[in-house]
Amino acid sequence: MDWGNVTVDDLFDALREVDWSSPPRPPSEFFSRFTVPKSVPKWDSRLKCNLYYYRTNYFIMIVVILGLGVLTRPLAIFAALLTALSLAFLNDSFAGSFSEKATRTVRRFSPQLAAKMRPPLTPVTRGRPSSKRAIHVCGQPRWVFVLTCSLVSFALWYISSGLLRVSVALLIAHLATILHASLRTPNLKARFNTFREEFRAVWRNYSEI
């Protein structure tokens, strides 16, 4: 895959749709080899490749840095967790998995309520979905959960007076992510993994037809 031809929008769409349940790469691979890119196009391609391949590692690193920044403020810790949850809901795989597990848990106690938590059916025309299926969480549009978690987390940030700390922590976390993604040399395993996930995505789209 030529990452130089991948736009920022394509990268965000891929990160939104890809499965994030895969475990992070081992530290021996994550901190293996670093080199300075020889040109701006090579840097651009390397940055996108590493952001996609090491996405779970970067997410954990950002959460850890945020946690260290608000360690002495309990309310800020809850705010950080809600912020991470609101961002996680933007991923299709996480939102669907969370909704399925929550519905399955509620079904044990109240089957009627669990039935209301199911996503609405997508209209079908000539055997195919008439439109792209919208993501629902517990029967509600995804944006409801994203907006709720974001508003509550912002209120907790404000109450705990941790906005300055979290801003500095976020800045450090993002700089560390960009620095690592810029200097980490992509290996053959990363390229092979990209091709494999591309094949899975194509096969999944083909099976839905």
Swiss-Prot record:
InterPro entries recorded: Prenylated_rab_accept_PRA1 (IPR004895)
Q: What is its main location?
A: endoplasmic reticulum
The domain of life is Eukaryota
Q: Name one GO biological process term.
A: vesicle-mediated transport
Q: Name one Pfam family in it.
A: PRA1
User: GO cellular component annotations, sorted alphabetically?
Assistant: endoplasmic reticulum; endoplasmic reticulum membrane
Question: What's the protein's topology in the membrane?
Answer: Multi-pass membrane protein
Q: Does the keyword Transmembrane helix apply?
A: yes
Q: Where in the cell is it found?
A: Endoplasmic reticulum membrane
Question: Which sequence ranges are marked TM in the entry?
Answer: 51-73, 77-99, 144-164, 166-186
Entry function: May be involved in both secretory and endocytic intracellular trafficking in the endosomal/prevacuolar compartments.
What family name appears in the similarity comment?
Answer: Belongs to the PRA1 family.
Q: What is this protein called?
A: PRA1 family protein A1
- The scientific name of the source species is Arabidopsis thaliana
Gene of this entry: PRA1A1
